[in-house]
Amino acid sequence: MRPVHTTALIAGTLALGLSACTVSVRPNLGLQVSGSNLISGLKPDRGEGSTYAVGESVRILVGTRSAGYITLVALQSNGYASVLARNVYVQPGTTAFPRAQDGVAFTVAPPRGVQRVRAIFTRVRPSSDLVVSGTYDSSGFNTVTNAYVTSYAQEDRDVQETFFYIR
C-alpha cells in the first residue's frame, strides 16, 4: 500500500500538469479510417482546424508512405460534395494540392462554416472514377466514399479526413 503523502504528491502533480492542457473540440466527422496507414498526413496549409476568409487560397497537404493515387473530395457545411482532385499519381512524401501543373487554385468560397476534405489513397490506379455530386449528410458521404474503396484490398487503400473553417 502506498503512503498517503506519495499519493497526494502524485495527484497534485497530475492536477498541475493537466491544468496547463488545452482541450480542442472538433466536429464529429464519423469517418471510419482504415488501418493501413498509407496516408501519413493530411491538413490544410495553415493546419487542421484553421480559418480561411472567403476569397483566400487554400492548399491541401497530403503525405503518403507509398506511391499511389489520391482523390480529394470536399464536403461543404451545406452538405454539397465535390471532387477536388481525381486519381492523381503521387510519390511517397508530401504533395501539395493543387499542384503547379494542375493550373488551378483552391479559392475559398461560401458557404461559411466547416469545410471537410477527405483524401482517398489507393496503391493501384482506380478502375473507376469516384462520382460525387449533390448534397449529402455525413452518413451518405461516408457511404459513397466507403463503397468506392471497398473493392481494393485493405492493405492497398487508406482514407483520411481533415477540416478547416470558412468565415
Model-predicted segments: where are they?
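Secretory-pathway glycoprotein ectodomains that are cysteine- and/or Ser/Thr/Pro-rich
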Residues: 21-65, 69-167
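Sec-dependent bacterial lipoprotein signal peptides
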Residues: 1-19
